[in-house]
From Swiss-Prot:
Residues 401-480 are annotated as: Disordered. N-glycosylated. The catalytic core domain comprises three N-linked glycans which each consist of a single N-acetylglucosamine residue. O-glycosylated. Within the linker domain, all 8 threonines are variably glycosylated with between at least one, and up to three, mannose residues per site. All serines in this domain are at least partially glycosylated with a single mannose residue. O-glycosylation of the cellulase linker provides protection from proteolysis. Linker glycans also contribute to binding affinity of cellobiohydrolases to cellulose. Residues 18-453 are annotated as: Catalytic. Glycans are attached at residues 62, 287, 401, 461-464, 469-471, 473-474, 478, 480, 491. Keywords: Carbohydrate metabolism, Cellulose degradation, Disulfide bond, Glycoprotein, Glycosidase, Hydrolase, Polysaccharide degradation, Pyrrolidone carboxylic acid, Secreted, Signal. This is Exoglucanase 1. The keyword Ligase does not apply. The lineage of its organism: Eukaryota, Fungi, Dikarya, Ascomycota, Pezizomycotina. The modification Pyrrolidone carboxylic acid is found at residue 18. It is found in: Secreted.
């Protein structure tokens, strides 16, 4: 949400460009995933991941001389944006030894601190369809499922999985000076309109560059890169959030200075994108026992869990989880006039009314956001620490001068003194996040494991969203489209709305589809 004054928090003290070099070979780590069809048949897809261009070694095209050192540009090689793009190239990546990135079958692990010739912190990776093209997903009318292990992510870290409306080729077709393209991880954009990118639209971002005052490796340039963003999963072992961010222009576009808005600008709301989003964080919504480390929580973050997110054609977003073979719906929220567990227009309106702000609705809300989910979006997986706000917006009380009595201020149980990058990097260098078992297909198609209760008995179920109002002689309340309609331990409506039927996904969860 408040991403990412240094989403790159710290990395190799070298720079980046948008043509390619060959001093280090580029081999994308393989990663398989599954594409599912109605009825639950899934087929394996052969993919791979690529690290973002901002992490790469960049040097002169005719030598190994750095174009960028520490957090400043070479004045000789990079006197201006155009000259720098001509003089500099970005090189291949040693994924495991330099960046702590490893894959095995359908599993991707991202290490936090990796020490090789220099210190690297975190990484941002994209799923590839081919060696030169990002995999695109059309989320609207479909669901996305994955397994995640956040057990080693303490306060201050964010193991994120999300989608952005960036170009599938990394911008090559639009910007001829970008010859590196998706193969080298170019073209990033998000709803913060990041200005810490070294190259945007095939040009350097050196003009107006200001080195960071608290990070020896980063800075902010005169331009940013904007696009719509769907945060499926921003999380550590303490808190998690689901957040759509609309932009008035859906796809990637360049912005200038404080007109970019977002984390990187003095005027946070001055750009074309919504930097805050309509977030669903169970802890922030009052359910402090749903998600966290240990058996006292409904979802125990010391263990792997499955996350399933469904994008209704109406624009609403549903979420459920599976752990140890048991299904748990998103916990119910009571927020002003809203009661339910679906992220929809009513919820987002209530959140702004109760917690303050209007950025989400100002940028068009879910109606505008549907324009992004109805088109292709690129999958991003990352691990980062936060040099801007210490990740307090995710897992603590934020702003820090607020108290527990301030609606929406408490987002997790972490101390307001936690999350300082220097401390997190020194105290938890071996932290990592693992994403695996990615599945994508029509709503109801990706399925999930079934089985008995978790050790110690059933930890309980969460309240389903409020049933639709019934009419006529229908026997009892009717469950709305995509709502739960059955399963062991379930006591809500079992009759589905007209045009849908109750379909068994596993012994603990049936859904109106």
């Amino acid at each position: 949400m408040y991403r990412k004054l240094a989403v790159i928090s710290a990395f190799l003290a070298t720079a980046r460009a948008q043509s390619a070099c060959t001093l280090q070979s580029e081999t994308h780590p393989p990663l398989t995933w599954q594409k599912c069809s109605s009825g639950g048949t899934c087929t394996q897809q052969t993919g791979s991941v690529v690290i973002d261009a901002n992490w790469r070694w960049t040097h002169a095209t005719n030598s190994s001389t750095n174009c960028y050192d520490g957090n400043t540009w070479s004045s000789t090689l990079c006197p201006d944006n155009e000259t720098c793009a001509k003089n500099c190239c970005l090189d291949g990546a040693a994924y495991a030894s330099t960046y702590g990135v490893t894959t095995s079958g359908n599993s991707l692990s991202i290490g936090f601190v990796t020490q090789s010739a220099q210190k690297n912190v975190g990484a941002r990776l994209y799923l590839m369809a081919s060696d030169t093209t990002y995999q695109e997903f059309t989320l609207l009318g479909n669901e996305f499922s994955f397994d995640v292990d956040v057990s080693q992510l303490p306060c201050g870290l964010n193991g994120a999985l999300y989608f952005v409306s960036m170009d599938a080729d990394g911008g090559v077709s639009k910007y001829p000076t970008n010859t590196a393209g998706a193969k080298y991880g170019t073209g990033y954009c998000d709803s913060q309109c990041p200005r810490d990118l070294k190259f945007i639209n095939g040009q350097a971002n050196v003009e107006g560059w200001e080195p960071s005052s608290n990070n020896a490796n980063t800075g902010i340039g005169g331009h940013g890169s904007c696009c719509s963003e769907m945060d499926i999963w921003e999380a550590n072992s303490i808190s998690e959030a689901l957040t759509p961010h609309p932009c008035t222009t859906v796809g990637q576009e360049i912005c200038e200075g404080d007109g970019c808005g977002g984390t990187y600008s003095d005027n946070r709301y001055g750009g074309t994108c919504d930097p805050d989003g309509c977030d669903w964080n169970p802890y922030r919504l009052g359910n402090t026992s749903f998600y966290g480390p240990g058996s006292s929580f409904t979802l125990d973050t010391t263990k792997k869990l499955t996350v399933v997110t469904q994008f209704e054609t109406s624009g609403a977003i549903n979420r459920y989880y599976v752990q140890n073979g048991v299904t748990f719906q998103q916990p119910n929220a009571e927020l002003g006039s809203y009661s339910g567990n679906e992220l929809n227009d009513d919820y987002c309106t209530a959140e702004e009314a109760e917690f303050g702000g209007s950025s989400f609705s100002d940028k068009g809300g879910l109606t505008q956001f549907k324009k992004a989910t109805s088109g292709g979006m690129v999958l991003v997986m990352s691990l980062w620490d936060d040099y801007y706000a210490n990740m307090l917006w995710l897992d603590s009380t934020y702003p820090t001068n607020e108290t527990s009595s301030t609606p929406g201020a408490v987002r997790g149980s972490c101390s307001t003194s936690s999350g300082v990058p220097a401390q997190v990097e020194s105290q938890s260098p071996n932290a990592k996040v693992t994403f695996s078992n990615i599945k994508f297909g029509p709503i109801g198609s990706t399925g999930n494991p079934s089985g008995g209760n978790p050790p110690g008995g059933n930890r309980g179920t969460t309240t389903t969203r409020r049933p639709a109002t019934t009419t006529g002689s229908s026997p009892g309340p009717t469950q709305s489209h995509y709502g739960q309609c059955g399963g062991i331990g379930y006591s809500g409506p079992t009759v589905c709305a007209s045009g849908t039927t109750c379909q068994v996904l596993n012994p603990y969860y049936s859904q109106c589809l």
